[in-house]
């Protein structure tokens, strides 16, 4: 079922949030009013991507389903109609980006991983334009290991040891093997150590008989330059050059610990829970134990970490006392840390979050602040209020018993108010509510199947008592023998993504663990996450003052082209100018409009795909073309540091070595039947005929003439009017669509055009006069494109003009009143290939079916009865298949279910 049918049957059922009992004070009523206004004006969208696999290899396809929700109850969003999904490379640059239409909050897409991509830790990032106004921590941002056995069959085995001397010396040992474990002996290895963008060491080594190199370096600023990478350039015996990036997560064994009093402060005379978090220098939790001592050296309390370096203890702090923690870490190191200062005046919260039906909140005040006053508790998330109540203090405390049934699942902020509008204490909790989860069962007609046998999967969502059982779902089936996975705690899941990670500041270690087989102990562990990482997105000072957050990016409802028409070489707007847009593709014909009094024009509700080029033409009111057209450009989202950086894998090829072997077998079989282009690792050494061609003034970073193909002026046909026409059919491994060149290695990514050293869009090719061209150099092989990094991932065409040393040819392409425009359109989603072995005449029936992703079904929608089904055929290899289904229903209930079958 496709997106359009889903739109036709999906009706989002909004419902109101129940408020609490208790008579509020005028101050609280004002706060609640401001919170409501904030929630209405700045609703929070979240994104989850369901991927078909937890990791990939170069040559693979990444298949994903996107879910965009809004508000605390995770209802499918109608606010934004466009989703951006980026694949960010190890160099922290965007390698691929797609723009996808959202239909009732859902979409689907894919990435093709070209052979030119290197091994490394990639990131898949998703967001709407509206989400860009807020902290990037709310983006969907996941570390994605991608291995390479197509153009890089070298497996690195890295280890780093540290000496915590004043200069922090690091000893590195790296062993290089092939996928079968054989060593790469006598291989030259050039290395460069980069920490936080600074080069701190470089050198050259040759591997020994076991394929090993070893070198030392010193990080003189270990507390400023905490992480980095080792860049390797390897020269193999068969004259290949392989580049690798090995993450260097730390250069120190220095551990740290922080203490977090519940609700922010230790209030004298009150039992106080203090959480703590111990971290190794790589940002991962480390085991620790210790004791708390007062100023007299008396042991007051003891503590020990639970999971991920976190834990908590309780004691009664005394006024005027100072407390120190003595800690021993799991690696044997020790430290002493002062606890926060004890406060003699103030407020505090104590929360019991372990009861099934209610939440107990105790509000404490110091004696000087009691005086029979009232205190108010507000439970909210990003301005959406779920509970508000005011109680009079009895002595120095007030107790609130809050029913859980009306609280949504996920992160909730508890805020305490006294006699003013600014909070006096805050505490974050995670609320568990089964009503926020959609019951989902998976059934197959059998539990055991033969090879290449049809499997029918039946899904049942919800229960008969539900008012609606319509749900949007997606299913991924993988062969676990060919795609080995761990216990699943390192995989992504819809539960932690939408309920936890998007509402927590910073890195959460293995968030899926808290939702896999949850029990009382894991509830306590999750509460430690809240105590150590909970934060408020509300700036209370600004809220009370009526100061609004800056909104730069509006929710996008459709594709648009807009801009302003001005007098030529000036800034004076031209009103009533006629503006016409014409697409060069088949999606859109001609559309025109008239500028307003400010000279502005806007074409909205457009529908076009990525490879569409537009000509925008303007004429003034009298039909004259002596005007300038300036188009609006929304800047692309910058690549910021990922909060999930500690999830990076040090040696990707090694970590998924079994998978890479399996994909090699699969790719070889596909190549045999012409379904995949064969990779030639030695393309870079082909020098026949090419060296005879003289290339002058070339900006080729590999050196003039060092290309996969060179076309000279003499070879260009002068019977063509534009360069793209001249080159069609002449460039090996290059196809043209609408005048735009694509390498057959990366058929969905335009080649990078470099004109006299200036980087240009591929769509500029038709505007270049072929009579002015001296040479055209084509770079397709990894050996030639590697130096261009992510800019060369789709291939490079280097054009040198006959005045190539002038450096300004590209800027001379100008026509008054007309501009060409190649905006990012919608990505044209491909369909997952699913073989049908019931068709005996299938020409591919003899091919070995070595799929790793057995099936991908992104468009499942259950009916009113909660039922849906899909089918697929098993593959060639025996083993255990995992069927994982995720999604949510129209009420925002989240669904996740797993089922296993055996193939013999």
Short names for language-model regions:
Residues 109-113, 122-123:
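Ligand-binding face of N-terminal immunoglobulin V-set domains in extracellular IgSF glycoproteins
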Residues 737, 741-782, 806-814:
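Periplasmic plug
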Residues 84-88, 190-192, 289-293, 376-380, ...:
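Beta-strand signatures of extracellular beta-sandwich domains
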Residues 1-30:
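Bacterial Sec-dependent N-terminal signal peptides
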Residues 102-108, 200, 207-214, 305-310, ...:
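Short, solvent-exposed loop/turn segments in extracellular or other extracytoplasmic domains
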Residues 66, 126, 174, 232-234, ...:
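Hydrophobic/tyrosine-rich beta-strand signature of extracellular beta-sandwich/beta-rich modules
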Residues 25-45, 50, 56-57, 63-101, ...:
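Contiguous segments within soluble domain cores/interaction surfaces
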Residues 38-42, 53, 57, 114-119, ...:
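Surface-exposed, low-complexity/disordered segments
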């Amino acid at each position: 079922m496709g997106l359009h049918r889903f739109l036709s049957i999906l009706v989002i059922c909004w419902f109101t949030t129940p408020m609490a009992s208790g008579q509020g004070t005028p101050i609280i009523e004002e706060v609640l009013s401001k919170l409501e206004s904030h929630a209405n004006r700045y609703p929070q969208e979240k994104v989850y991507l369901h991927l078909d696999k937890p990791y990939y290899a170069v040559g693979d396809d990444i298949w994903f389903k996107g879910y965009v929700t809004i508000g605390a109850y995770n209802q499918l969003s109608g606010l934004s109609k466009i989703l951006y999904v980026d694949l960010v490379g190890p160099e922290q640059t965007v390698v691929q980006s797609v723009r996808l239409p959202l239909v009732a909050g859902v979409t689907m897409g894919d990435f093709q991983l070209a052979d030119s991509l290197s091994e490394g830790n990639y990131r898949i990032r998703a967001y709407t334009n509206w989400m860009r106004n807020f902290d990037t921590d709310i983006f969907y941002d996941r570390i994605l290991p991608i291995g390479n056995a197509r153009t890089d069959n070298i497996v690195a085995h890295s280890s780093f040891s540290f000496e915590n001397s004043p200069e922090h010396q690091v000893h590195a040992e790296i062993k290089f093997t092939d996928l079968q474990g054989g060593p790469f002996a006598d291989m030259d290895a050039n290395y460069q150590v980069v920490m936080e963008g600074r080069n701190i060491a470089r050198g050259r080594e040759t591997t020994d008989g076991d394929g090993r190199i070893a070198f030392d370096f010193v990080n003189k600023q270990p507390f400023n330059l905490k992480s980095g990478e080792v860049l390797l350039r390897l020269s193999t015996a068969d004259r290949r050059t392989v580049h690798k990036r090995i993450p260097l997560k730390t250069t120190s064994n220095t551990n740290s610990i922080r203490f977090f009093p519940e609700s922010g402060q230790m209030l004298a005379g009150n039992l106080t829970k203090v959480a703590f978090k111990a971290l190794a220098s790589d940002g991962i939790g480390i085991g620790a134990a210790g004791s708390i001592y007062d100023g007299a050296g008396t042991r007051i309390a003891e503590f020990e970490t639970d999971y991920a370096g976190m834990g908590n203890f309780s004691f009664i702090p005394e006024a005027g006392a100072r407390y120190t923690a003595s800690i021993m870490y799991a690696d044997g190191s020790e430290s002493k840390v002062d606890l926060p200062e004890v406060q003699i005046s103030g407020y505090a919260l104590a929360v019991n979050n372990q009861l099934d039906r209610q939440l107990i909140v105790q509000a404490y005040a110091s004696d000087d602040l009691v005086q029979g006053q009232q205190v108010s508790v507000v439970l909210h998330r990003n301005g959406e209020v779920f509970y508000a109540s005011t109680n009079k203090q009895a002595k120095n405390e007030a107790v609130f018993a809050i029913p859980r049934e009306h609280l949504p699942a996920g992160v909730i902020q508890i805020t305490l108010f006294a006699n003013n509008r600014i909070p006096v204490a805050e505490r974050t909790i995670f609320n568990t509510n089964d009503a926020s989860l959609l019951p989902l069962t998976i059934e197959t007609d059998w539990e055991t199947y033969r090879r290449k046998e049809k499997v029918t999967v039946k899904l049942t969502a919800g229960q008969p008592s539900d008012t609606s059982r319509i749900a949007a779902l997606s299913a991924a089936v993988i062969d676990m023998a060919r795609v080995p996975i761990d216990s699943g705690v390192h995989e992504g899941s819809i539960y932690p993504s939408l309920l936890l990670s998007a509402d927590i500041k910073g890195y959460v270690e293995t968030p899926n663990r808290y939702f896999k087989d949850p029990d009382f102990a894991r509830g306590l562990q999750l509460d430690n996450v809240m105590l150590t990482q909970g934060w408020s997105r509300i700036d209370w000072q600004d809220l009370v003052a009526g100061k609004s957050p800056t909104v730069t990016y509006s929710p996008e409802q459709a594709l648009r082209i807009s801009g302003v028409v001005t007098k030529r070489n000036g800034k004076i707007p031209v009103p009533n100018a006629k503006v016409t847009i014409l697409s060069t593709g088949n999606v859109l014909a001609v559309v025109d409009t008239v500028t307003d009094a400010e000279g502005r024009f806007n074409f909205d509700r457009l529908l076009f795909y990525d490879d569409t080029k537009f000509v925008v033409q303007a004429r003034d009111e009298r039909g004259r073309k002596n005007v300038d057209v300036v188009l609006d450009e929304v800047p692309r989202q910058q690549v910021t540091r990922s909060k999930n950086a500690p999830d990076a894998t040090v040696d990707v090829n090694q970590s998924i070595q079994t998978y890479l072997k399996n994909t090699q077998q699969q790719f070889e079989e596909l190549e045999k039947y012409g379904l995949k282009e064969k990779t030639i690792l030695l393309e870079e050494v082909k020098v026949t005929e090419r060296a005879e061609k003289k290339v002058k003034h070339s900006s080729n970073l590999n050196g003039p003439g060092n290309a996969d193909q060179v076309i000279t002026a003499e070879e260009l046909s002068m019977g063509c009017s534009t360069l793209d026409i001249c080159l069609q059919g002449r460039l090996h491994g290059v196809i043209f669509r609408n005048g735009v060149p694509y390498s057959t290695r990366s058929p969905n990514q335009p080649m990078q055009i470099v004109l006299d050293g200036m980087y240009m869009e591929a769509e500029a090719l038709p505007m270049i006069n072929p009579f002015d061209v001296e040479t055209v150099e084509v770079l397709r092989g990894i050996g030639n494109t590697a130096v261009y990094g992510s800019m060369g991932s789709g291939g490079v065409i280097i054009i040198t003009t006959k005045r190539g040393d002038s450096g300004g040819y590209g800027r001379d392409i100008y026509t008054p009143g007309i501009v060409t425009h190649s905006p990012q359109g919608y990505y044209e989603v491909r369909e997952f290939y699913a073989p049908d072995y019931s068709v005996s005449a299938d020409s591919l029936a003899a091919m070995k079916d070595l799929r790793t992703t057995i099936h991908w079904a992104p468009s499942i929608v259950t009916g009113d009865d909660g039922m849906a089904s899909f089918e697929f055929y098993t593959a060639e290899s025996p083993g255990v298949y995992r069927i994982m289904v995720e999604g949510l229903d129209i009420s925002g209930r989240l669904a996740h279910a797993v089922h296993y079958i055996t193939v013999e």
